[in-house]
Amino acid sequence: MAKAAADKGLKLLGITEHAQGIPGTCDEIYFHNMRIIPRKMYGIDLMFGSEINIIDHDGTLSMEEKIIEKTLDIRIAGIHLPCYEVGTVTQNTNAYVKAIENPMIDIISHPDDSRIPIDYETIVDAAKENHTLLEINNSSLDSLSSRVGAWQNLQIMLQMCEEKKVPVVAGTDAHFSSAVGVFDHVEVLLQEMNFPEELVVNRSVDVLKQEILQHREIRKIGRD
């Protein structure tokens, strides 16, 4: 993955394996080992983290807080159907909001699947209040994606993000090396909507890192 990112001219690569709950994913020992992995390879910066599962309507996460805090450079939470029972719009929205409010979480992954209906205004408002990033997922927009209605759902979410000045992060969801750095669908969507570049935090390495750092400082103050 790092070599592919370097070959494509990227300056930073985030590697976020699925946490426990997804069949066949990494166990706890893998994430503990992240502390010793180099943060620079092939001339690019590396950030290691996890896409942690939201496992119930109360926003419970599938990874212990001590592991999240001590081992992860990037802390993402998302809903995945193998480990989540779909509820009502209110229940699904609450699951996301509780994860957004969790000070351990930096990013909410692909909140764009019509199979998990949510209230987008509530989600965007919570993201703004808690300084949590919402992901625009390139894989969701692909015609082969198992997620349903992502294009329309992301249009709704992005319009609200623009109106409320809520920043987003673009993600490739690359599960193999050739997909690293591929944002083709995201680029089309953002261009069609004329979405402000200044609200896309990974437009530069410095902006992304600063956004995550600022998010954690604000949330830390809120906890103290």
Which stretches of residues belong to each language-model region?
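Short acidic/histidine-rich active-site segments
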Residues: H18, V166-V180
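His/Asp/Glu-enriched short active-site or ligand-binding loop at hydrolase and phosphoryl-transfer sites
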Residues: L133-S146
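Conserved short secondary-structure transition element at the edge of the structured enzyme core
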Residues: L154-T172
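Extended substrate/RNA-proximal surfaces in nucleic-acid metabolism proteins
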Residues: A19, G24-I136, Q191-V201, V207-D224
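Conserved active-site loop/cleft motifs that coordinate metal ions or position small ligands
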Residues: E135, P167-D173, V200-N202
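Histidine/acidic-residue-rich catalytic or RNA/ligand-binding cores of hydrolases
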Residues: G24-E28, P117-V124, L144-M160, S177-Q191, ...
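Alpha-helical scaffold segments that flank or form the walls of functional sites
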Residues: M1-L13, N33-K40
